[in-house]
């Protein structure tokens, strides 16, 4: 097993421990954030997924549109 594979396994374990679940429809690991507003609740979906050997963090708003995306270095996210 390569160092990259070990880092990915540790990263996935870390995000699972932080409330993410694998979501087939997004082909990545997701969790929902929710906040109260004067008009009700707003939700956003946070997704970590691997796309062509690059891990990405993607945030979707209540309307389903992407409002943030970033390529990430998984080693910076490991404890």
Annotate each language-model stretch with its function.
Residues 1-3, 76-79:
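Short intrinsically disordered terminal tails
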């Amino acid at each position: 097993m390569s160092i990259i594979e070990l880092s990915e396994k540790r990263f996935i374990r870390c995000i699972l421990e932080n409330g993410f679940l694998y979501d087939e429809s997004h082909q990545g690991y997701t969790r929902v954030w929710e906040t109260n507003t004067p008009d009700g609740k707003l939700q956003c979906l946070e997704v970590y997924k691997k796309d062509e050997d690059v891990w990405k963090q993607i945030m979707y708003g209540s309307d389903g549109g992407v409002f943030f995306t970033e390529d990430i270095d998984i080693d910076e996210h490991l404890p």
